[in-house]
Structure formats: structure tokens, C-alpha cells
A protein has these predicted regions:
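Extracellular glycan-modifying ectodomains
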Residues: 2-163
Length: 163
């Protein structure tokens, strides 16, 4: 690495006015970069989660995260998510929402106790975020991963009707 030249791309993004920015997944990098750039004002239940579908995110919003990780199971191929096996960290799938948590569950506590705690924590975080969304004029939902314009439009349309 010593002496290696790295090329960085810069992008001209339009300036926008926003009252609130929140992560809606799909992996850890959104929450990481929001925090790194001092833009992560509130912790989102979707921070650090792996999820593939905006439809699931909307359904969680609509249900106030009521069933979030209450029906869950250990992922058998955990190494695919966390690389080298970790004796403490457990990879857990929310069976109801097809979402994967790689940072919240540990081997030294039973799954049911942890899932109830994660659900309670997520619901408390969601109340704060929901209040902030409702009191904001301009909200930015940030997400990493594959982008489909039609799916994103539908998500934003549904969220705008919800709030």
C-alpha cells in the first residue's frame, strides 16, 4: 500500500434542504457514513441491518415495528455475513421480515430474551424517528444497495400517504 496512488471520484450533488436524514438500510454502510459525517441524529431500527426490500421497510413503518425480530432464527451460514466465525456474535434472521442482524445478538444470552430486547429497542427508536418525520418538512431516507427507480417512487409515495 505504501506509495500506492488512490484515485477518488468526486460528484457534484445538488444542495438540498433537509430537516432530517435517516437510514433505511440495506446494510451497515449507510449508518456508518451518516455517523462519520455527523448526519446521524437518531439511531434507526434499520441501522446495521441487512434487508433487500423497500416493501418490507414500508410494512415495518406501517406496523410501528411491532413484530420486528419477535419471530427469528439463527442463520446457519453465518460466515457468509460476518466473514471469519465469531464465537460471541450470532447472525439472526427475522423470519417475518426477511431481515438479517449481524451486530445485535450474542451467544451468551438466549435468543428469546435478546429478540424481545431488540424489538423493544427498535420500537422506542421508531417512536422518536416517527415524531421527527411528522414534525419535519423535508426528510431524506438513505439506503445502499441496488436502486430501482419505480420501487423507490412507490416507497416514497406510500410513506408520504402514511405521514
Amino acid at each position: 500500500m505504501c506509495g500506492q496512488i488512490c484515485k477518488f471520484s468526486t460528484f457534484e450533488f445538488p444542495k438540498i434542504k433537509t430537516d432530517f436524514i435517516t437510514s433505511i438500510g440495506s446494510m451497515c454502510r449507510v449508518a456508518h457514513h451518516l455517523r462519520k459525517n455527523h448526519l446521524r441524529n437518531l439511531a434507526s431500527p434499520l441501522d446495521w441491518m441487512i434487508n433487500d426490500k423497500l416493501e418490507v421497510v414500508f410494512e415495518l413503518f406501517k406496523s410501528d415495528f411491532k413484530e420486528f425480530f419477535l419471530s427469528c432464527s439463527f442463520v446457519k451460514n453465518a460466515d457468509d455475513f460476518i466473514g471469519k466465525a465469531d464465537i460471541y456474535r450470532q447472525v439472526v434472521r427475522d423470519d417475518s421480515n426477511d431481515m438479517v442482524a449481524i451486530h445485535y445478538f450474542y451467544s451468551y444470552e438466549d435468543l428469546e430474551t435478546q429478540s424481545k430486547r431488540i424489538n423493544t429497542q427498535a420500537r422506542k427508536r421508531w417512536v422518536l424517528i416517527k415524531d421527527k418525520i411528522c414534525s419535519s418538512k423535508n426528510v431524506v431516507f438513505m439506503r445502499s444497495g441496488e436502486f430501482d427507480l419505480e420501487t423507490s417512487k412507490e416507497f416514497l409515495h406510500n410513506v408520504s400517504k402514511l405521514f
